[in-house]
Design a protein with these regions (language model features):
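Conserved hydrophobic beta-strand within the GNAT/NAT acetyltransferase core sheet
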Residues: 87, 118-121
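Conserved acetyl-CoA pyrophosphate-binding loop and the N-cap/start of the following alpha-helix
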Residues: 92-93, 97-105
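Active-site rim helix/loop that mediates acceptor-substrate recognition in acyltransferases
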Residues: 26-55, 68
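Conserved active-site alpha-helix within GNAT-family acetyltransferase domains
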Residues: 112-116, 123-146
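A conserved beta-turn-beta hairpin within the catalytic core of GNAT-like acetyltransferases
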Residues: 72-84, 94, 113, 143
């Protein structure tokens, strides 16, 4: 497994990430259209965009986990410019702390480049993120789900 900052040339990874996000969350509006996901990911990893699309892949280039830093993902959260989002470990790779390791690696990469607070929202992983140093900011509804907004 190795950390990858995805570029537009990583077409196989972009396809795998798009498919994994769509499969996991297709019941929610931002992930119901795989073509829209693909375009969003290509834009996110373009050279003139400060956002980061990252992943872990195995030695054969198969996706294990993905996470991104996203500019302005949610509006209305005071001073929340940068967000950690689209964090997903593929089902076959779960249970090995890959998601947590990827988040830490991406956070360090982001912090070295940008240095501002990073936010996230989660409906059900608050305890995990608290153990990783994230602090609760507020509760709100996002995509028809009750979520906790957190900051680090």
């Amino acid at each position: 497994m190795h950390f990858i900052v995805v570029t537009p040339q990583d077409t196989q990874l972009i396809e795998q990430i798009s498919s994994a996000l769509h499969h996991e969350w297709r019941h929610l509006p931002p992930w119901e259209n795989i073509s829209a996901i693909r375009m969003r990911l290509i834009e996110r990893c373009s050279h003139d965009n400060p956002q980061i699309l990252s992943c872990y892949a195995d030695k054969n280039g198969n996706l294990l986990a993905t996470a991104s830093t996203i500019l302005h993902e949610l509006t209305g959260v005071h001073q929340a410019t940068w967000w950690l989002g689209e964090v997903l470990t593929v089902p076959e790779a779960r249970g090995h702390k890959m998601g947590s390791k990827l988040i830490e690696e991406l956070y360090n990469c982001y912090h070295n480049l940008i240095g501002q607070s990073l936010y996230l929202y989660t409906p059900d992983m608050q305890q995990l993120y608290r153990r990783m140093g994230w602090k609760d900011v507020e509760e709100r509804i996002v995509n028809h789900e009750q979520v906790t907004v957190m900051k680090r």
